Amino acid sequence: MGQKIHPVGFRLGITQEHQSRWFAEPSRYPELLQEDHKLRQYIEQKLGRLAQNNAGISEVRIERKADQIDLEVRTARPGVVVGRGGQGIEALRTGLQTLLGGNRQIRINVVEVQRVDADAYLIAEFIAQQLERRVSFRRVVRQAIQRAQKAGIQGIKVQVSGRLNGAEIARTEWTREGRVPLHTLRADIDYSYCTAKTVYGILGIKVWVFKGEIIPGQEVATPPPSPRDRDRDRGDRDREPRRRQQQRRRQQFEDRSNEG
């Protein structure tokens, strides 16, 4: 079951949160759901992968309070969203108000993605961009996995489907590094799907990222230390005796100067 079901929907209320957090009267639910879809579609058109200024939008979360809409935009390049002097975010707010009609109160909060190479949607977006430039899919997938491993994840699985490298017959190939426990509910798994439009047709990209297990009472999965951090810690430990020797030499030198 864990292999087939959507990993995020399977864990809603356990380790994952809803992307839309609001309640409404039953008669208004269809209208508000359409509004949410329009908001996300507009932001994707203006700042997404196919836009002129790609801001690397990872996720858009929507909250509603009375007649106010709160948007949390998680992006890899917050400077592109905010713009010079806040002009970009004001233009985005004006466009969204025009889209919804009326003078709606819209508050936009821009959040920077801390680990870009560990975000499933941004990884899938990177692979799609490279495939559209006719780069070999094996090379792109290997590069994306290496970048994700350097970001400190515990496991990743990438699946690409379609006419790979322009083959006559479509096929599906996938690669996995590390652990990706899809059956474990406490596993913090980030999943995303993206499409690449090539001259041979559409390629589908699926990415699963395992960031660690969330223990009850613990909000965020603690990532394991990256090899670079371990090397840095080992280097610090190696440098400590040298520092002590240098301090001892300085003290001895100072003692000699005081005696003289």
Curated annotation (Swiss-Prot):
Molecular-function GO terms, alphabetical: mRNA binding; rRNA binding; structural constituent of ribosome
Q: Where is the KH type-2 domain?
A: 39-114
Bias (Basic and acidic residues) occurs at 227-243, 251-260
- Cystine links in this protein are none
Q: Which GO terms describe its cellular component?
A: cytosolic small ribosomal subunit
Keyword annotations for this protein?
A: Ribonucleoprotein, Ribosomal protein, RNA-binding, rRNA-binding
Cite the Pfam families for this sequence: KH_2 (PF07650), Ribosomal_S3_C (PF00189)
Q: SUPFAM superfamilies given for it?
A: Prokaryotic type KH domain (KH-domain type II), Ribosomal protein S3 C-terminal domain
From the UniProt entry, list the residue stretches annotated as the region Disordered: 218-260
GO terms, biological process: translation
Functionally, this protein is described as follows: Binds the lower part of the 30S subunit head. Binds mRNA in the 70S ribosome, positioning it for translation.
What the entry lists under PANTHER family is as follows: 30S/40S RIBOSOMAL PROTEIN S3 (PTHR11760), SMALL RIBOSOMAL SUBUNIT PROTEIN US3C (PTHR11760:SF19)
Q: NCBIfam families annotated for this entry?
A: rpsC_bact
Indicate the quaternary assembly.
Part of the 30S ribosomal subunit. Forms a tight complex with proteins S10 and S14.
The entry sums up its family as follows:
Belongs to the universal ribosomal protein uS3 family.
Identify this protein by name.
Answer: Small ribosomal subunit protein uS3
Corresponding gene?
A: rpsC
